């Protein structure tokens, strides 16, 4: 993915990052782009904050798009996927 243009008078982020819509995948993408910008700046704490913001954006996406699914449900599936990759098999 192409990184945004460098902004003239930066705040936290030195690249232009389009604003997403709360509850939509565009907000998750915004947080990913902010994470990448933090990494480009070698800003460890900022990167961790962006990861936290990403979790929040995912929770709001679920509330908006899949109200019966929780972040815990996603974590269960994530752990199962990790197990499958670790063991080298999907069946």
Residue ranges and their predicted role:
Residues 1-91:
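Flexible "arm" and connector segments at domain edges
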């Amino acid at each position: 993915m192409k990184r945004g243009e460098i902004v003239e008078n930066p705040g936290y982020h030195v690249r232009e990052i389009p604003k997403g819509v709360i509850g939509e995948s565009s907000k998750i993408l915004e947080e990913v782009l902010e994470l990448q910008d933090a990494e480009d700046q070698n800003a460890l704490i900022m990167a961790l904050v962006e990861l936290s913001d990403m979790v929040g954006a995912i929770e709001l996406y679920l509330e908006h798009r899949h109200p019966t699914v929780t972040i815990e449900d996603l974590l269960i599936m994530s752990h199962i996927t990790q197990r499958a990759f670790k063991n080298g098999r999907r069946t």
